[in-house]
């Protein structure tokens, strides 16, 4: 709706994450639960649903471990698929060419916030 301001939820501070780093969390937005993760790269933050497009399973192999060893890509724990930080595009693995589902996050005055009105799905 034009003129409507989407609600925002602060999920952490930018300084809470190393560069690069990742963090998983469960968000409750409009009474729906979402398993998501965020990735910091420099002053940018990217958010995605924690769901591999190949299997639908979670991407992390341990809590908050979403990145490959040299922290250059998001890596799926199940089949080692690699995804770019900036757009979630899979560049290697069984789901090459597929995309992670983005979660709308931004940095505002040093806080990482998720924007409710732009959330990708109604829940799962």
Task: Please place each PLM-identified region on the residue numbering.
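N-terminal pre-ligand scaffold of iron-sulfur
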Residues: 1-69, 84-85, 99-124
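Short cysteine clusters
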Residues: 52, 76-79
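Short cysteine/histidine-rich metal-coordination sites, predominantly Zn2+-binding motifs
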Residues: 66-75, 90-98
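Short beta-strand His + acidic residue motifs that chelate non-heme Fe in jelly-roll/DSBH
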Residues: 83-84, 92
């Amino acid at each position: 709706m034009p003129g409507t301001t989407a609600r925002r939820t602060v999920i952490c501070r930018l300084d809470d994450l190393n560069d690069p780093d990742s963090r998983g969390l469960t968000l409750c937005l409009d009474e729906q639960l979402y398993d998501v993760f965020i990735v910091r790269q420099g002053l940018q933050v990217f958010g995605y649903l924690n769901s591999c497009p190949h299997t639908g399973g979670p991407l992390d192999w341990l809590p908050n471990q979403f990145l490959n060893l040299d922290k250059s890509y998001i890596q799926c724990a199940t089949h080692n698929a690699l995804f770019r930080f900036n757009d979630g595009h899979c560049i290697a693995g069984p789901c090459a060419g597929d995309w992670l589902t983005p979660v709308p996050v931004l940095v505002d005055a040093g806080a990482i916030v998720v924007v409710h009105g732009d959330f990708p799905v109604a829940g799962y």
